Amino acid sequence: MLTIGGKQFQSRLLLGTGKYPSFEIQKEAVAVSESDILTFAVRRMNIFEESQPNFLEQLDLSKYTLLPNTAGAATAEEAVRIARLAKASGLCDMIKVEVIGCSRSLLPDPVETLKASEQLLEEGFIVLPYTSDDVVLARRLEELGVHAIMPGASPIGSGQGILNPLNLSFIIEQAKVPVIVDAGVGSSKDAAYAMELGADGVLLNTAVSGADDPVKMARAMKLAVEAGRLSYEAGRIPVKDYGTASSPRDGLPV
């Protein structure tokens, strides 16, 4: 069970809702993923314009928790303003803080992310900041009181997978709040690996929406997250330099 800000969720897979080939494919992929939490960019949604298409109308919202994000923000002030818009729409008081510091790499701005998170916490939001795999920054965010930490595996949409498993392991080891690996996941292998490292969840979008078959990939991600979590809980065998026979010779008659 994944718990964020006092809310409990069965699925540890958080799914983004952007860039699907069609509303129909998006809806089917969401259903197959069995995700409880769907994230979307407030700036790309027509939450106040009824005459414009809105993917939220295609879903049974009673089945999901919506996680608006502040994608497009370059400063703390912009992120806070976007978060307030999302809250004013009545969708949710949970917000993914995303403040991009580099338009080419799409890496987050650590200073502005800290500032935005602090302000939104003061305003009563459930705050989930998207951050780099900086171990110290993750600790600083937790000290502020954020409800989860979302370190990137690699740049957003890059599909490079987990580039720095050591740092992610350090973040997971020290954190007292959920750690959700976010960004850069390219395949089910990456999702399973993140969970095997001990992450509490995985958030992804492009890996599903950009796949040749988004619906099939959504199912693959669901199974990968479940398998990775089970593997972590089971406890893997230690890595050794040399082989160890699985059938011991002690006590054999010959």
From Swiss-Prot:
Gene3D superfamilies listed in its UniProt record: Aldolase class I
First and last residue of the signal peptide: none
Pathway: Cofactor biosynthesis; thiamine diphosphate biosynthesis
Keyword Transport (UniProt): no
UniProtKB keywords: Cytoplasm, Schiff base, Thiamine biosynthesis, Transferase
Top-rank lineage group of the source organism: Bacteria
TM region positions: none
Alphabetized SUPFAM superfamilies for the sequence: ThiG-like
Recorded GO MF terms: thiazole synthase activity
Chief localisation class: cytoplasm
Ligand binding (1-deoxy-D-xylulose 5-phosphate): 157, 183-184, 205-206
Entry's EC annotation: 2.8.1.10
Protein name: Thiazole synthase
